[in-house]
A protein has these predicted regions:
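Conserved acidic donor-binding segment of nucleotide-sugar-dependent glycosyltransferases
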Residues: 323-324, 328-335, 344-349
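Short hydrophobic beta-strand element within catalytic cores of glycosyltransferases
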Residues: 308-311
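Membrane-proximal helix-turn-helix segments that form the acceptor-binding/catalytic region
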Residues: 142-162
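Aromatic "clamp/platform" in nucleotide-sugar-dependent glycosyltransferases that forms part
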Residues: 291
């Protein structure tokens, strides 16, 4: 099959769950013999560029990065890429059997083309992310949320099939109550490249049984302030290393100083994927205190490295973390529960080690990319065959 993915950025430009998902799926479906391309954002100065990466073709469509623009920067950047993608697709859509949108990337395109079958994978919904972030939205973000919600509904309504990364994500989509004709709604989880659990990248990082790791963007929705506050109740020998960057970093740095835990909490900033994995392997466990997660890829990555996790009992997290099997679940709004989970993992190393091994087995069985690519391929074939039958039926009726 000729398949085009649309994703605003890829892991070699920006580290994130959607970016990793798109890259891994493209790579593994290429290995299964398909002709894969990924349409992503490129330089306005260079125009359309294409090159090979991991066996698939990357096509960069020129757009204007607007993050520094004084008014509506996020919305304008999103629109800039999607207009560029739409213009490119007007000329090139017929080259592909399937066009697969990742999140809101490409939302202008779906118009139920008979020649092209359109899929959309939903990784989250903007109104829920903002709701659970527990922060006051400024005017820019309120306007962005309104438009982004419309973009999501447009992609949902006009795609031939919709994929959710978890049962929780599918429940959230069902609550939108959009009046649409019946269409396939499928659940295919995110995965992890098991090979990446091997030692790569910075080999100078040594094991440290006193360090717990957080990986994620520094945003209130990730529960970062609750985590720092919980560190005051955690065993004094435990150190927290936080990997990632985000809009709340400056505020978090001041909060760490105010809470008096500067000697035990270290912000490392954004890291390469290899170094993230090595930091995970260094710690005794990983903690993710998010207020909302549709799945949580980093939990799978930690388990793949043989590490137990302490995570919020919210959203799609319980679909990948079974309490006291491959990690511990807690209420992210309860500071004491967060601290208790970290202390339990720290004070019971044999139990923590066994949870990590359980997690490694779980990921290998259910969340490896080879299996997910095969499942996705099967869904493509099923939807294409169904659409072909409908088209043939319409033709017979017309005749």
């Amino acid at each position: 099959m000729r398949i085009l993915y649309i994703c605003k950025s890829l892991p070699h430009r920006y580290q994130g769950g959607i970016q990793t998902h798109t890259s891994e799926l493209a790579e593994h479906l290429t290995q299964r013999g398909h002709d894969i391309s990924v349409l992503t954002a490129g330089s306005i100065r260079k125009g359309v560029q294409s090159y090979e990466m991991k066996g698939f073709t990357v096509i960069e469509a020129p757009y204007l990065p607007m993050r520094r623009f004084p008014f509506l920067p996020i919305l304008l950047e999103e629109l800039s890429f999607n207009v560029s993608a739409w213009l490119w697709l007007k000329k090139n859509q017929f080259k592909y059997d399937i066009v697969h949108l990742q999140g809101r990337s490409g939302f202008l395109f779906p118009k139920k083309h008979n020649e092209t079958t359109v899929f959309t994978t939903f990784h989250g919904l903007i109104h829920l992310e903002n709701k659970f972030s527990k922060q006051i939205l400024n005017l820019d973000r309120r306007i962005h949320q309104r438009f982004a919600s419309y973009f999501e509904k447009n992609a949902f309504k006009n795609s031939d099939a919709v994929i959710s990364v978890s049962h929780e994500m599918q429940r959230e989509l069902n609550q939108l109550k959009i009046q649409i004709e019946e269409k396939p709604r499928l659940i295919i989880p995110n995965g992890v490249a098991v090979k990446k659990s091997h030692n790569e990248g910075n080999t100078d990082i040594k094991s440290d049984n006193n360090t717990i790791i957080f990986v994620g963007r520094l945003d209130r929705i990730k529960g970062i302030f609750q985590l720092v506050k919980a560190m005051k109740k955690v065993d004094k020998n435990v150190k927290l290393v936080m990997l990632g960057d985000g809009m709340n970093r400056t505020e978090l740095e001041e909060f760490i100083r105010t809470e008096g835990v500067s000697d035990r909490v270290e912000l490392m900033g954004a890291q390469s994927n290899d170094n993230v994995l090595n930091w995970i392997k260094r710690g005794f466990a990983l903690v993710l205190p998010s207020f909302h997660e549709t799945q949580g890829i980093v939990l799978l990555e930690a388990n793949t490295c043989g590490k137990a996790v302490a995570a919020s009992n919210v959203g799609g997290v319980p679909e990948v973390v079974t309490h006291e099997y491959n990690g511990l679940l807690f209420n992210p709004y309860n500071i004491q529960e967060i601290a208790d989970a970290i202390n339990q993992l720290y004070r019971n190393p044999e139990m923590t080690k066994q949870m990590g091994e359980n997690g490694r087995k779980l990921v290998a069985e259910k969340f490896n990319w080879s299996k997910i690519a095969a499942d996705t391929e099967g869904v493509y074939k099923q939807v294409l065959a169904s659409k072909k039958c409908k088209d043939e039926l319409k033709l017979e009726v017309a005749l």
